[in-house]
Amino acid sequence: MKEDEPAGPKVEDLIAQAKMVLDFNWTGEYTRPGPRLYPHQWSWDSALIALGYARYAPDRAMRELSHLFDAQWKNGLLPQIVFNPDFAAYFPDASFWHADESPDAPTHLRTSGIVQPPVHATAVLALLRNAAEAPGVRSFCEKAFSRLVSWHDYLYRERDPGGENLVYIRHPWESGMDNSPMWDAILESMFLYPSDIPSYKRADTHFVSSEDRPESAAYDRFAYLVKLFAERNYDEARIREDCPFLVQDVLFNSLLCRAERDLAELARTLGEEPSAFEARARKTAEAINDKLWDGERGTYLGFDLVSGAHIKVLAAPNFVALYGEVPDRKRARAMLARLSSPSFSLTEGTGVPVTSYDRLGFGFSSVRYWRGPVWVNIDWFLMHGLRRYGYEDEADRLREAIVRLCREEGFYEYFDPTTGMGHGSDLFSWTAALLLDVVLEG
């Protein structure tokens, strides 16, 4: 632990508080992302939460991931949400998704019909590294390995029909960054008749301020896409024929690149052959560099497969390519320069780093979901990415930001980059878990 922690509760007290958040949200099978706004199990939330558990509670990490893997579809799809039938007051609920229309969906659990970013191999590898001697860990990792292979195979088989080694997402919710300005132009181009929009009633604005959440027009399009998937029985080939949202996203592919490397490391440790995963990681990194790099902006940009154009929006998640070890040293320096500019304030300007969207961009908001607030998971990815390239001072600044936000404001979903005030769900699980990972690290 660092000796120069900011003033506030002692580190031991902060650790205890973070563990209390996770205990409060633990259901016995999985950890709720938040106590009111998010009652079900979310895919990448559970993987990030498991990173924290791997530091002190490996049994719970195994149970967390096992519950998610138990809901995996026959085709390898790892669902965004596993629904808890005890919590019905949520939109969209299981009945809205009609995921059971797919012959691949599980019959013993209700799930959504989309995915979230692939950080699961990273979580399993962290568990093996941090708790290899704990009872049941190696056996769990051996079983999880086949689940992870099936998951990654699904992505490369079903989401990369052109064989580019870049996978696409088909819904903003699949990005994990639902309300990012990166999706605005695509959503606005989707002309819908009233009859196209399924009936729904939002639950999120009952628990947090509507000023913090996506606007209704965006939600109409989110709901329309779900309807489109269900009408096509979640058949990927049929969906991509006319789905208006097909994006090769930087964060998703960068995390997949990292996850493929981590899957290769798992394979080596477990006595399996790693070469196929190493090759896919290398090819995906090459594809990100060849297709998604934008020299003018000094970072990578997502690609809209429908319009055939790059998404020219500066957002912090596009810098997660550093975590995936995608750029060479020259490009990494350019990315650091952009992160250090007033756009994101890693080292310049005032406030808390880093904003999730360009401070100078149209529609920047310090409080609205993914349109400016600081997210601990993005800071965590960037912290590790910068450290991999030797940028220790900048990585330490992000580490200090994570600790300071949790210590001074609490374990919120996201934070105002100017004031530090917490927004969204309070008692947010991945914030607590990643704080634990940071302060309990070696």
From Swiss-Prot:
Catalytically driven reaction(s): (2R)-2-O-(alpha-D-mannosyl)-glycerate + H2O = D-mannose + (R)-glycerate; (2R)-2-O-(alpha-D-glucopyranosyl)-glycerate + H2O = (R)-glycerate + D-glucose
Keywords in alphabetical order: Glycosidase, Hydrolase, Plasmid
Of which family is this protein a member?
Belongs to the glycosyl hydrolase 63 family.
Described by its record, this protein's role is as follows: Hydrolase that catalyzes the hydrolysis of mannosylglycerate (MG), a solute produced in response to osmotic stress in thermophiles, into mannose and glycerate. Can also hydrolyze glucosylglycerate (GG) to glucose and glycerate, with similar catalytic efficiency. Is highly specific for MG and GG, and cannot use mannosylglyceramide (MGA), glucosylglycerol, mannosylglucosylglycerate (MGG), glucosylglucosylglycerate (GGG) or trehalose as substrates.
Task: Please indicate if the UniProt record lists Ribosomal protein as a keyword.
Answer: no
Species source reads Rubrobacter radiotolerans
Per its UniProt entry, which superkingdom is the organism in?
Bacteria
One BP annotation, GO: oligosaccharide metabolic process
Is Hydrolase a UniProt keyword of this protein? yes
Active-site residues, record numbering mapped to chain: 178, 413
Activity control, per UniProt: Activity is not stimulated by divalent cations and not affected in the presence of EDTA.
Query: Can you name this protein?
Result: Mannosylglycerate hydrolase
Q: What class of enzyme is it?
A: hydrolase
Q: Which GO terms describe its molecular function?
A: Glc3Man9GlcNAc2 oligosaccharide glucosidase activity
**What does the organism's lineage look like at the top?**
Bacteria, Bacillati, Actinomycetota, Rubrobacteria, Rubrobacterales
Q: Which gene encodes it?
A: mgh
Q: How does activity depend on temperature?
A: Optimum temperature is 55 degrees Celsius. Retains about 28% and 14% of maximal activity at 30 and 80 degrees Celsius, respectively.
